[in-house]
Amino acid sequence: MAKKVAVIGAGVSGLSSIKCCLDENLEPTCFERSSDFGGLWKFAEASEDGMTRVYRSLVTNVCKEMSCYSDFPFHEDYPNFMSHEKFWDYLREFAEHFGLLKYIRFKTTVRSVTKRPDFSETGQWEVVTETEGKQDRAVFDAVMVCTGQFLSPRLPLESFPGIHKFKGQILHSQEYRIPDAFRGKRILVVGLGNTGGDVAVELSGIAAQVFLSTRTGAWVRSRSSVGGYPLNMMQTRWRNFLAQVLPSRFVSWNQERQMNKIFNHENYGLSIAKGKKPKFIVNDELPTCILCGKITMKTSVKDFTESSIVFEDGTIEANIDVVIFTTGYEFSFPFFEEPLKSLCTKKVILYKRVFPPNLERSTLAIIGLISLTGSILVGTEFQARWATRVFKGLCNIPPSQKLMAEAIKKEELIKRGVIKDTSQDKLDFISYMDELTQCIGAKPNIPLLFLKDPRLAWEVFFGPCTPYQYRLMGPGRWDGARNAILTQWDRTVKPLKTRTVPKSQEPASLSRYLKTWGAPVLIVSLLLIYKSSLFLELVQSKLQGRFSPSRILWYIPQNS
């Protein structure tokens, strides 16, 4: 008999969790409190039951080839970066293609999730739901929490002295949808993340003036890179390998140099404060808005008056009408009891950011409580792939006693300052995907690929690390993965080819040639230079009568 799995939430992680359950012959039931699927990607003029929704102008930050489900590419005519409407259309196509909608119970709120009395033997959960005022109870063999990390707005008003005196409008970005109501006003946006940058840029087109306050600064990236290709398509295994083997100081220095080549972040008031961790945001227009004076960068807020803001550097901005906090969200699981509720919000102690460490049975998975240097959608899909195989007993995780001991030890070390708290850091996309798929048995074997299929292996290692790579082998293998990888650049260029133009000759082809072959040629060149230097030393040693046969065998110079 198939195990029953409760999936809470029908957003991007909920949809992939339903599909992963079906792939493993589990029986999913998804509970969604709103009237439609898609989570925050389903735009609404006003929040439904306080749910977070996208603002109208939102455009994706990760290109389509790097942010799709691993066995369901975007259509080739979809733009590389798309509006929320287009992205929701993709989710609809995915749900309809795999027949996921029939497993979703809409307008159903999960009230409680509690362990059954025999949990230590069965791992079962009792889930209480409410639909139109009527409550229902059901027993499930496993639970996947897919409510995301944008439930409860973080509005730290107590951290801002004098804010109770401020007479203007105060709101969190969760309430922001369209800019029309802010026309002609002087606005302060607090917080420089992706949302803060987007909101400030959009408002700068109609506001009298926009001020953007940040404590730490940020590196601002464009969506496009060398040659106009999407920046994310430069995220390769080769680059990831270099970042791991090269000295971290050199990597940081080079990163800073590259960012400042585009524009000097210090001149624009965006540079990272000393001692702070590097933070990157994606925004194509923010530098131009600063350059044109539409947005004024400010330090952190020191004090509020009735209509003015005092900043840490002593400057004062008067006649402020609106303050918008883009200060993020708190993790919230109101349907859990303590201590499970608190443990699940501490993502740093979740085993591989998925499983709570204190459960005797690994039948509860927290899906999507991650920050990545790549697509969250892809990360949640692989979390779900792994979790469903754990539920089925095909993958194992360490005993709860061991996990809890390690979690407590880690928390103690963080409190004592021995190790850093990395809970707010973004995980490296490729490393985390490799880690999860290693558990599944779906991580691509690069050396084997080079032996069996050199063309594919080349694209896998030196090309963009697209999700299709993790469907080449192992459980969940997809027959279309190879073709998807070899045609990913075609789908990238296709939506741009809307006008017939004369074919460019040398510049474009040379650029592509250098991009493809430059790194390998450099490595080979360095090896040749190294071997040449050894050869010259051998010749010199021979001439000086210091020749040793071991030099030829090992290519290692010996002291005379």
Swiss-Prot record:
Keywords: Endoplasmic reticulum, FAD, Flavoprotein, Membrane, Microsome, Monooxygenase, NADP, Oxidoreductase, Transmembrane, Transmembrane helix. FAD binds at residues 9-13, 32, 40-41. The keyword NADP applies. GO terms for molecular function: flavin adenine dinucleotide binding; monooxygenase activity; N,N-dimethylaniline monooxygenase activity; NADP binding. The keyword Iron-sulfur does not apply. GO terms for biological process: energy homeostasis; negative regulation of fatty acid oxidation; xenobiotic catabolic process. Detected in liver and kidney (at protein level). It catalyses: N,N-dimethylaniline + NADPH + O2 + H(+) = N,N-dimethylaniline N-oxide + NADP(+) + H2O. The chain crosses the membrane at residues 519-539. Its EC number is 1.14.13.8. It is found in: Microsome membrane; Endoplasmic reticulum membrane. InterPro entries: FAD/NAD-bd_sf, Flavin_mOase, Flavin_mOase-like, Flavin_mOase_4, FMO-like. Gene3D superfamilies: FAD/NAD(P)-binding domain. Its cofactor is FAD. It is a single-pass membrane protein. NADP(+) binds at residues 60-61, 195-198. Its main location: membrane. One of its GO terms (cellular component) is endoplasmic reticulum membrane. This protein is involved in the oxidative metabolism of a variety of xenobiotics such as drugs and pesticides. Belongs to the FMO family. This is Dimethylaniline monooxygenase [N-oxide-forming] 4. The lineage of its organism: Eukaryota, Metazoa, Chordata, Craniata, Vertebrata.
